[in-house]
Amino acid sequence: VEELGRRIDLGALLLTSAKPRIFIAGADVEAIATITDRAEAEEASRRVQRLFTAWENLPFPTIAAIRGTAVGGGLEISLASTYIVASDREDVRIGLPEIKLGIVPGWGGCVRLPRRIGIAPALDIILAGKALPAKTAFRLGLVDALLPDASFEHLAIQFAGAKTTTRRNPAKERRGPRSARSLLLERNPLGRSILFSQASKRAVAATRGQ
């Protein structure tokens, strides 16, 4: 990633997967289970956080092109990208299932997802461990463009080409439609306190207090 940051010949970078029906399915669950030391867990998380932050800070637009399952770390690196595009195929799923393992997204997803779609809908995704259809993710503003699968690669390249003169995706483009209730809760201290109290209770319930 550091080497990419020094490239002056790149106008944009498209992140894709060569695997059929899988973008990135996240971390190795068995590898996570072997970590029993808190310091080791924190360092492992920080190591990937540094990588994703470096990706996020590249001096040109990055586009995550999702054409299959993008969960856990797959969504987290997508959130660190400037834009996210996804195939309209029915089996495409996007989400953060970590809560089902008794943990929370540790590579920046808990911060970047609320920035993109708002606190309330982000908490709903994180605390339910939901994997959303691409069309739902697009409707929430999580995905910037929904592309027909038959021409996905061509259209993703076109999308990237159109973004070569921009550095950041404007906030107004990133935010999906939110209800008056969500806006009211997010924009005042009492509302945020209510949201986080509810989030804490849901997290305890989802992990059975573990």
Report the location of each language-model feature.
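Short, structured coil segments at secondary-structure junctions
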Residues: A25, L58, A80-S81, G141-L142
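Glycine-rich phosphate-binding loop at the start of an alpha helix
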Residues: G26, S45, Q49, G72, ...
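Intrinsically disordered, low-complexity segments enriched in small/flexible residues
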Residues: V1, R6, P121-L123, P133, ...
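CoA-thioester-processing core
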Residues: L51, V71-I126, L140, A156
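A structural preference for short, pocket-lining loop segments at secondary-structure junctions
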Residues: V1-A39, R50-R67, S87-V92
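Phosphate-coordinating loops and pocket residues in cytosolic domains that bind phosphorylated ligands
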Residues: A25, T34, L127, R139, ...
